[in-house]
Every structure is written in structure tokens, then in C-alpha cells.
Amino acid sequence: MAKRNIKIFSHNDLDGFGAPVLVKTVQDVMFPDAEFDLTSIGAGRIDSELDYWFKSPATATTTDVWIMDMTPDSEHTMQELNQQFANHWLVFDHHETEAALRQKFAANTIKPADAKINPSATSLVWDWLKTLPNFERLSQERQQQLAELVELIRAYDTWDWQNDPDMSEKERQAADDFNQLFWFYPLEYSEKFVQSVFDKGWTTYRQDNDLLIQTLNDRRAKYLKSHLKDVVEVTADGHQFGIVYASDYKSEIAHELPTQQPALDAALVISPKSISLRSNGKIDVAKFAETYYQGGGHADAAGGRLDINPIRLGEQAVADELEQMTSVKKE
């Protein structure tokens, strides 16, 4: 049996790690002939990362390329994948911004098994795995265990844990707790953390980390209360935005702000390198992020890159004010 060297490019959030870790979890049973190499990427960087990788010697020994939780923005990048890997590349993505481009390469795009369910990258991988012959070699118990984790990731990433009226309170809390734990660990430990949850199953992992989860929930409640007091409102592109700086809990703050202030059309949460956007339905924030922040996502939830450093600007403002105060005093 010929060995397969599969290169995976994926986003660096929970869904972005969940998708490749799911594949690695079933590797022994479903992909015994394969070796996986994962590169995690921030939003808006897939094209430049692929462009760099195409020129590397690694492409000569790579048999397949899988892209998860993101889609290249450039049709040229997709054509390059087609040219170098023919029918040996796949995209597992659900973001609306690049849906039209994925449709042009439909043969290489994994679609959800149930169109009525909002997909995530992890759920798309799961749907695809279930169509492969070796899937039945997984025990029923293991299938159920993995299906639960896939659903928790999907529910959080699509925000169904907040918006689906049919979801149980237990499942909502589990999805929230899983995501909380993910962001607690530094990025370099993200894959290891997600893999440990997939190895143990959610029930066992949650029981082992009950105190930590409670501590994180308490910390988040205080953080949101504090940061939602400092909102700057601005009118841009004909819409009213509320801007908040946050280094943590960006998605939660972005979701909560329009709820607390319904007059706002959208929340824009900034951190040193990125933005998170949430809409109340009056603006397509995916298009807004694509136009102004090299990003994208969904009509009601999106993200992008921030080219200015708000921390540096804030520090400089304090320095300028200090210089002015001290010079006035000398006079």
C-alpha cells in the first residue's frame, strides 16, 4: 500500500483545530497508510501561506492537500491547487464569503450531509468520514463519543448554542465550556488540548476539569461586565457600530454588545491583531470584513485582520499627553 503524505492547512480556532484532530483521531482505523502534517493559520492568511508553500520542496513529497475552516480568497490559488494536485485536494469550509469560489471547484469541496443544519469545518469532516468504507470499523461507542464532540464544536462555531431553540441546556453549556477551555490554553498547546479531549471523550474530560471550568466561567462574567462599560460608538458605511477593545472573550463580547445596545447595527471588537464582528441583522458583516479588514465569515458573524496596533496607539497617546502635561508645568 502506497504511503500518503497529507498536508493540512486549517484555521487556529476550536473548529479549525477540531477538524484536523478528528482526522488524526481516526487515523489508525481509517487512514493507516497516511501521515498528516498540520499548519495552523490566522484569518486572511491562507493565500499567502499556500503561495509560500507551493515554492517549497515539501510539495514534491505531498500526495494530498486538505484545507479546513477556510477557503483561499484567490481563484489563482485554487487553480494552482488543481494544477499541482488534480483530484487530490479538498476544502472543508462553511464560510459564506467564499461560497461562490468553492462552487467553481465543487468537485474538491465537501458539502454538508444535511442542508438544514448549519455546518462547521469539523462537522463537514465528520460527514465526509461517514461516507468512507473504513468508518464502520469504528466501534459504535467510539462513533457516539466523537459525534458528541463534533456537535459541540459545530454548535459553538455556528452560534447555534445560543440561537437554536431546540438545543438542550446541557448541550449549550457543554459547547460553551469546551470553547472556554480551548481559549484558556496558549496557541502552541491548542492541538494537544483538543487531541486530549478527543482521546478521553467530553464526559470524562469535563469531570476531570470541573473546577477549572467553573473558575473560567466566573472570570469571563467579570471580564464581560468590565469591558462592556467602555464602548465607543461610531457611524461608518452608513451603520452604527459599537467598538470595544478586548484581548479575551472577543466572540462573547461581540455577541453580547448588540443584545445590550439594540440601537447598534453591529459590534466591532478589536484586539492587537484582529477584529470580531457581530450583526443584529441590519448589516452583512462578512462583506464589511472582506471590504475593510481582509476577512470574511457569515452575514451575522465575521472576523478580519487589524493593520494598526491599538495597544501601541494607546501607549503613544499616554506618552503624548504626559509630555504635554510636563511641558506645561515647566512653563
Predicted regions and their residues:
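Hydrophobic, aromatic-enriched interface-forming segments
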Residues: 150-229
